[in-house]
Amino acid sequence: LASSAASDVYKRQSPASIVRFCRKLEYEGYNDFKIALAAQLQYSRLSNDDINANYPFKGTDSVYTVASNIANLSKESIDITMKNLDLEELRLVVLMITKAKVIDIYGVSGPLRIASDFQYKMFRIGKDVRISQMINEQLFQAAQSTSEHLAILISYSGETEEVIEAAKILYRRKIPAIAITSFGENRLVKYTQRVLYLNSSEFIYSKIATFSSTLSLHSVSYTH
């Protein structure tokens, strides 16, 4: 199913039934569902941990259990990121970061907050990293970018409309761009030159989502 085209699935079930099923699971449609399924299958092959990445602790857990689960989750996320890391891709990403005079971060909500840590680390080594919190500011930023800029676009699903809109502007202007996204086909990777993949243990629509995997990828990029 994860590798099946929508047209193949629709031969066995009506399109309306498939869409209803996907939306019942809180996905926008079949493609979103397929991306999440492929990502989760990839994670399942690599992970032996019983910790739920979306809800790593319960209200009844002790302080030690909470701290231990978060520590183990962060370690596992970094380990899985390293296992999945394409070293040649990382080398090319680092070259792009080194060459750029200005690095612009694009995304919404949580990933932007985590990107602030990356911004601070890069500031310490003399790199100009800019983060606009408002979507309209990001679109203006994309429209004003030059060849001296590098765009890093963060979207776990690779289908975040605001990020896709910025990616299209950057693509038309031929601005170098890197995607940070989950495994599987998605629209975002079509508009970027390089891709770094996230650990897929955190589901797209989770309440405690993507903090450890995004942070680990930022950290890997910073330290190489």
Regions found by a protein language model. Name each.
Residues L1-A6, Y10:
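Single conserved hydrophobic/aromatic residue that forms the stacking wall/gate
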Residues R12-Q13, S17-E88:
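HTH-adjacent hinge/linker in prokaryotic transcriptional regulators
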Residues S74, S216-V220:
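Short, hydrophobic-biased amphipathic alpha-helical segments
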Residues E89-A100:
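Glycine-rich phosphate/diphosphate-binding loops that line cofactor/substrate pockets in enzymes
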Residues T98-S216:
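Glycine-rich phosphate-binding loops that contact phosphosugars or nucleotide phosphates
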Residues T223:
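Conserved adenylation A10 loop of the ANL superfamily
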